[in-house]
Every structure is written in C-alpha cells, then in structure tokens.
C-alpha cells in the first residue's frame, strides 16, 4: 500500500485552474496531489539575437521554487546572485519539452516565455510544471490565433510528463516526496499524445537497474502520460481542437 493509498499505476489527483492570473496570455495553476505550480506564458513580438531573421519563433522557460514551497525555507536565487544547477537543468527541460511539440516556423518571430513558479513542492515539480505549462501554452497560442489566424497552427501534439520509480522493490507512478526520497530508481518521462518520447531521465539512486526494469518503468510511465493528457484535454475542452490539425478553422 502506498503512502496515500493509491494503486501503483495511478497518478495523484490533478486539479487545473486556467486563466489564473490577470495579465499573462496563458495562465494555469496546477495541483498534482500536494505539489502546486503556477505556470504563466507571456508573448513577446521579438526573438533572441540568434533567431533574428530566421522567421522562426522561440520558446524559453524559467523555473523557480518559492522560499517556503518546501519544509524548510529555500533561499531565493537572487539572494545568492546565481541560479543553482538544478534550477537551470529544470528550466531547460521545460523549454525543450514544449519546443518539441511546436512548429517554431509557423509561430513566426515571437518569443513565448514560460514562467513556472512552485508554490508547494511534494515531489514531481518538474513534471507538474511541464504538464501545466502546456495548457497555458495552448491558451496563449489560441489568443494569438483568434486575433490573427496562423497559416499553420503551431502546436502539433499534446505533451505531458510524469515520474516513475522503484520503491521497496515496487514500480510506482507519480512519486510524492516521501516516495521519491526512498526510491531505488527515479525516472522522469516526457511523451506526446501520439506515444512518442520527448525525454527520459533515469537514475539508479541506490543501485543500477536492468533493461527489464527500464522497459517496465517506461510502460508504467506511458500509462501515466495517458492519464495526464486526459486531464489536459478535459481542462482545455473545445480549446484543444486546433492541436495537431495544422489548420486555422
């Protein structure tokens, strides 16, 4: 029996609140169990210098944990005058995940800033951020599309992320913090609704893991991705109809 009574192949309860803040073009507050993340998407009518003149857009992300999102206060990055390695790794991961399902050429020379702020952390903050940020991204792109329809709708597919791991020799989905801290193997999986992998991050925390265990964890992760994408679709409802069509109807 897991800490919260879930089955091994079950994700935590997910609650999505769209249009959470007033000013951002896309804003989602996502709760996965006790992990809570605010995902805002802002649009700029310019691109980084390395993208100028290409006709393509860009998507970049910033990730931050509020000081009391954890059991003990976390010092703000600004107070240390540097971004820690974990934060840098996660925000790059979020950016890669979202760029993987967007036709940047179709987007045009615009930058979409993804800001993910962890309000409360109980495991899976990076996966929660990716899954929530995708919904906010759709809202932001749809806002552009309604003002001036894209010739080709830029978002090609859904993308979501989940964690899997081996705890007490059990393979489990969507680890909370207590489970994550005891995991023999910890893995983050990012996939599209078409079943394609975007990224797999797997670590043998206590010991190596076998190819068989890897395959079983990937299968478990795929089940979790389907559950999370169903949540995304239910949240977006009719606003998801353009995804993958390439059209402007």
UniProtKB/Swiss-Prot annotation:
InterPro entries per record: ExoRNase_PH_dom1, ExoRNase_PH_dom2, ExoRNase_PH_dom2_sf, PNPase/RNase_PH_dom_sf, Ribosomal_Su5_D2-typ_SF, RNase_PH, RNase_PH_bac-type, RNase_PH_CS
Origin species, per record, is Clostridium botulinum (strain Alaska E43 / Type E3)
PANTHER family, alphabetized: EXOSOME COMPLEX COMPONENT (PTHR11953), EXOSOME COMPLEX COMPONENT RRP41 (PTHR11953:SF0)
- Might you give the EC number(s) for this enzyme? 2.7.7.56
Q: Which GO terms describe its biological process?
A: rRNA catabolic process; rRNA processing; tRNA processing
Q: How does it assemble?
A: Homohexameric ring arranged as a trimer of dimers.
Checking PROSITE patterns in the record gives: RIBONUCLEASE_PH
Task of the protein: Phosphorolytic 3'-5' exoribonuclease that plays an important role in tRNA 3'-end maturation. Removes nucleotide residues following the 3'-CCA terminus of tRNAs; can also add nucleotides to the ends of RNA molecules by using nucleoside diphosphates as substrates, but this may not be physiologically important. Probably plays a role in initiation of 16S rRNA degradation (leading to ribosome degradation) during starvation.
Identify the gene encoding this protein. rph
Which transformation does this protein catalyse, written as a reaction? tRNA(n+1) + phosphate = tRNA(n) + a ribonucleoside 5'-diphosphate
- Coiled-coil region(s) at which residues? none
Family recorded in the similarity comment: Belongs to the RNase PH family.
Residues reported to bind phosphate: 86, 124-126
Give a yes or no for keyword RNA-binding in this entry: yes
- Which keywords are on file for this protein? Nucleotidyltransferase, RNA-binding, rRNA processing, Transferase, tRNA processing, tRNA-binding
Among the GO molecular function terms of this UniProt record, one is:
3'-5'-RNA exonuclease activity
Kindly report, in one word, the top-level EC class recorded for this enzyme.
transferase
| Name recorded for this polypeptide | Ribonuclease PH
């Amino acid at each position: 029996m897991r800490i919260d009574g879930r089955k091994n192949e079950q994700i935590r309860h997910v609650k999505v609140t769209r249009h959470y803040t007033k000013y951002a073009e896309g804003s989602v507050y996502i709760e996965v169990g006790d992990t809570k993340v605010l995902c805002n998407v802002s649009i700029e009518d310019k691109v980084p210098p390395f993208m100028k003149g290409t006709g393509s857009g860009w998507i970049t992300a910033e990730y931050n944990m509020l000081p009391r999102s954890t059991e003990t206060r976390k010092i703000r990055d600004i107070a240390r005058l540097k971004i820690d390695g974990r934060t840098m790794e996660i925000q790059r991961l979020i950016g890669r995940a979202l760029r993987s399902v967007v036709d940047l050429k179709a987007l045009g020379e615009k930058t979409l800033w993804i800001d993910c702020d962890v309000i409360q952390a109980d495991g899976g903050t990076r996966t929660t951020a990716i899954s929530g940020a995708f919904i906010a991204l759709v809202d932001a792109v749809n806002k552009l599309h309604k003002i001036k329809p894209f010739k080709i709708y830029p978002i090609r597919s859904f993308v979501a992320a989940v964690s899997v791991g081996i705890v007490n020799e059990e393979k489990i989905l969507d680890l909370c913090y207590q489970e994550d801290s005891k995991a023999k193997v910890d893995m983050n999986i990012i996939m599209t609704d078409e079943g394609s992998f975007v990224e797999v991050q797997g670590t043998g925390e206590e010991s190596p893991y076998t190819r068989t265990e890897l395959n079983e964890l990937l299968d478990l992760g795929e089940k979790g991705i389907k559950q999370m994408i169903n949540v995304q679709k239910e949240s977006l409802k009719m606003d998801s109809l353009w995804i993958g069509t390439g059209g402007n109807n």
